[in-house]
Amino acid sequence: MGGMATREPWSEIHRRLSARDEDRLSATDLDALADALFWLDRPLESAEMWHRAYLAHMERDERAEATMAAWRAFYEHLQIGERAVASGWLARMRDLAADAPGSLEAGYVALAEASWAHVGGDAEMALGPCREAVATGSERDDPNLTALAIETQGRLLIELGEVAQGLGLLDAAMLSVLGEDLDPLFEGWIYCELLSTCRGLADLERASEWTRAAMRWCDTLAEGRVYAGICRVHQVELDCLHGDWSRAEEGITRACADLLAVDPRYAGEAHYVAGELHRLRGEYDAAESAYRRAHELGRDPQPGLALLRLAGGQAASALAALRESSVCREGPPIHRARSLAALVAAELQGGSPERAHAAMGSLSQVTDDNESSYLRAIEAHCQGSVLAAEDRPEEAVTALRTARRLFTELGMPREIAEVGLLLGQLGQRAGDIDGARLELEAARATFARLGAAPSLATADLLLAGTAADRHGLSERELEVLDLVARGRTDREIAAELVISAHTVARHVSNIRTKLGVSTRAAATGYAYTHGLLHD
């Protein structure tokens, strides 16, 4: 096994061996043909060819080689969802390994045992054979087995709650990829598994670093689009977060086409990410199509589809989808956090701050259970939104400044600008027109550069609001003043705005102070004179 630099192209191997009569193909030829079919993105044919290679090796009593052919057939069938067939191959491997305890092949079989236990939902049971595979790979000086088994052990530990230890093992596996001459099968395997794990944990700093390495490796692939397509989806998502939407558009178009053409099982995530980019740009029809295609390909379209409904003013539809979807309760931390953040936004838009507060509690639990700056930033942003809706501006500003600091450290311009929008609104409510304008103009500039049309329109609308002379009154104070002018008592105003009578009294006092009047009647007269009342 070795790197790809001196390897004959897979298409040439396939052409050369396919041209021969079947009875002239050796067992080794069948191995090479099966491998070529894998790299040419033909998994079903590859699985069948590994079966033929296994039989050829067994006919020659080449038990070690037969075990490895069975190992490849096992994973091919496992990946395409044929678990019953995969189970049969595992049984054959067990029989062969029983005759060669401690052999290198037995180590590969142990890794297959770990994978089988893991897909069966028992990560703890998978640890034992995985550690056996690590030990065998080290003892037999096989870097491929050692690196893949270490990476698998890291993922298992993360799933079992030992995140720091698991991440350390993932980093160790990646160093093997970068520093040792691994077979490309194992390089691509480790890259894809590691990137998926880091993304799921919302460890975006680590994901960014390893994604760059993965894409450099993908650039060396002359053939085989599955590994490159999967890695490219991760790169596109990071490009979206870091504000390079032009590169993201180019990358996701290519990823969708490549994955759909060669292995649709992996194309669902690509179409979902495409939907996210379209939604953020305000290309709502294209976003809808992408989310629906993702769903057809087996990817839950939430929370993106719910956020699309929310952007269209359909809060009830968004709430129904998010409350019913399992993404708020299950799956990797990043999926749950994003879904709960969407639920918070939908509850607020739907006029249910109490429910939004409850969703915040669930989001905080996800954040507390995971060390992630990105999750903490999402939590702080949502917390600021909820506090603003609860008319607790000082606490809201504190939370939003925390969110902005974290998003800034992560290099996420759109998220920074979204926080700026809310800070600008809070500034408007407090009568800090200059401060509000600074926030809103900065946010607007970012949205214009990115091409985030919906957020740009919101910024323009809010900036128009700062231009109107509201005499220093906040939105809530204007609402209270309008009701005072209609003759409502503090208790009646409190009931209508769903706030306490004490809060109403505080607003009335602030109104009198800002307008320079001493009575409710004088405030009413001032409001009529200066056009501060609703039509």
Where are these regions (language model features)?
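Amphipathic alpha-helical segments of tetratricopeptide repeats
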Residues: 14-21, 51-61, 90-101, 131-142, ...
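Linker/hinge segments immediately adjacent to helix-turn-helix/homeobox DNA-binding domains
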Residues: 373, 385, 389, 393-395, ...
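Alpha-helical adaptor scaffolds
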Residues: 348-351, 357, 364-401
